[in-house]
Amino acid sequence: MSGRPKLVLASGSPRRLSLLNQAGIEPDALRPVDIDETPTKGELPRACANRLARAKADAALRALQIDDELRGSFILAADTVVAVGRRILPKADLVDEASQCLRLLSGRNHRVYTAVCLVTPKENFRQRLVETRVRFKRLSEEDIQAYIGSGEWRGKAGGYAIQGIAGSFVVKLVGSYTNVVGLPLNESIALLGGEEFPIRAGWLDAG
């Protein structure tokens, strides 16, 4: 490749894009992929996040191999899993799913895992998994019903968005906050920088 290498974010998540922008990085393209995100039987949360991030990266790479403009780009993919013990919570799309998640999380500790997978222009894969521990306050029925009414939970792992109203539910957080939002910035930028992507190129324009 000549000139600045290109970066493709293999996600349609506004949160992941916003986090990259926060770090001064503007992807050249967004290429969300459609894969089956159902955990396999007995799959552990860590393994699930790692498998799905790799599957998203693989799918994006296949798509870009036939794209003359973006072939040879860096590809960044990620998957976030919320778990209570070994139980993986869904990415809630239905009210019943979100209600069940919130009742399970109420007053308890849970863990958020995000796996980040980077594909280099030479089609090498680099991957990191980040874990954050979160504890929610005990949620009242009024809390749950009002939060369901907000709609903020739709499509979110574990049925909540920490960067929104649900941030007020958090009693304690140990680890990376951006990991819970959907993309651990420190580790993601380290992956890119380790493969000589110009991570600081946009900093002069960040102000």
UniProtKB/Swiss-Prot annotation:
Per its UniProt record, what Gene3D superfamilies does this chain match?
3.90.950.10
What are the top taxonomic ranks of the organism?
A: Bacteria, Pseudomonadati, Pseudomonadota, Alphaproteobacteria, Hyphomicrobiales
Q: Which cofactor does it need?
A: a divalent metal cation
Q: Which SUPFAM superfamilies match?
A: ITPase-like
NCBIfam families, from UniProt?
maf, PRK01441.1
What InterPro entries does the annotation carry?
A: ITPase-like_fam, Maf-like
Intracellular or extracellular location(s): Cytoplasm
Name listed for the protein in its UniProt record: dTTP/UTP pyrophosphatase
